[in-house]
Amino acid sequence: MMFKLGVLLTICLLLFPLTALQLDWDQPGDHMLDISSEIDDRWFDPVRKCCMRPICMCPCCIGP
C-alpha cells in the first residue's frame, strides 16, 4: 500500500511541480510598476514613457 502511495505522489509531483506556481514579482508587468513609482511625476514624459531628466539612468532612457 505504501509503495502505491509513493508512486502516486511521485507521479503527481512530476505532473504538477511546486515551481509551476506563479510567484509574486516574477512577471515583467510587476516590475514596470516599480520603475514608474521611482520616477518623479514632474519629470515623467507620458509620450516617451520615460523621464526627461538631463542625466537619466532609467532603463527606458539607457535602452538598447
From Swiss-Prot:
GO CC terms: extracellular region
Cell compartments where the protein resides: Secreted
GO MF term list: toxin activity
Tissue note: Expressed by the venom duct.
Annotated S-S bridges: 50-60, 51-58, 56-61
Segment forming the signal sequence: 1-20
Modified residues (4-hydroxyproline): 59
Chain positions listed as propeptide in the UniProt record: 21-48
Key words of the record: Disulfide bond, Hydroxylation, Secreted, Signal, Toxin
Main subcellular location of this protein, as a coarse class: secreted
Superkingdom: Eukaryota
Similarity comment: family membership: Belongs to the conotoxin M superfamily.
Entry remark concerning the domains of this protein: The cysteine framework is III (CC-C-C-CC). Classified in the M-1 branch, since 1 residue stands between the fourth and the fifth cysteine residues.
Record's protein name: Conotoxin reg3k
